[in-house]
Amino acid sequence: MDVEKEMHDMEENFSDMKPTFAIYGDVGVGKTTFTSYAPNSLLIDAEGGRASIAKTPNSPKILEPENLSDLGEIYLWLKANQDKFDSVIIDTLSEVEKWAVEESIQKAVKKDPTKDKDLATRSDYKKGGTKVGRVARMFRNLDMYTFFLLHERSDKDDSTGAVKLGPKVMPSVMSDLNGFTDIIFYIEVDDSGNRKIRTSPNRKIRAKHRIGELPNVIDLGTEFKDFRIDTVLEMINNS
């Protein structure tokens, strides 16, 4: 590392920092629509969720990888062409995790044909988690806004019985996300159809924000046209 060359002053505002987001919620709450309003974005559609943005006025560029190898090629292209986009969205990291575990299973089957190809072992999950963490770190290091979309899962504390919502990934990957993301948002829809962003943790929900001053809950109303990440980015930048 060239210390003199790499040393710099603290960024003056949020937009210069190009933070990393993890955004999670139940199926159908609008994660893809919400983040598709990110500035000059590339949507990496690993799950086939892009149809939801057809009714919106925005038009991110779209790539449809089928496996980790494709995702690696996309990363290398972005690294060499970081001036092409201001934002990259992986939809979803939960699906990428499935790819990683399946790849670990198939490699194990090649080594041992007697292994059940439909049964993931502890080793498969461990290797898959390591791969996903590596992929997430690579994209996090790009000079652009990075958004990891995830489904939600509930975890029960065996000692207290308490249930807490968080992103649907393995605990090892969740630990990575906690460490290197700047912002974790939870999207929910209440009984009236209001879409809300949880920005801070409580006893039942995992969330955080390291940058800017935000309310614990951002209410973006019932209209999809108002449910957009650029509104929240502006809130953070002006806080």
Give the role of each language-model region.
Residues T146-D219:
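Phosphate-binding/switch region of NTP-binding enzymes
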Residues D2-W99:
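Conserved P-loop
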Residues N13, T33-T35, M138-F139, M174-N178, ...:
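A general structural signal for short secondary-structure junctions and capping/turn motifs
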Residues M1-K5, S15, P19, S192-S239:
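C-terminal regions of RecA-like/P-loop NTPase motor modules
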Residues T92-D176:
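P-loop NTPase motor core
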Residues L78, A136-F139, T181:
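Hydrophobic, Leu/Ile/Phe/Ala-enriched alpha-helical segments that form helix-helix packing faces
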Residues A38, P57, N141, N178-G179:
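Short, well-ordered coil/turn elements that cap or connect secondary structure elements
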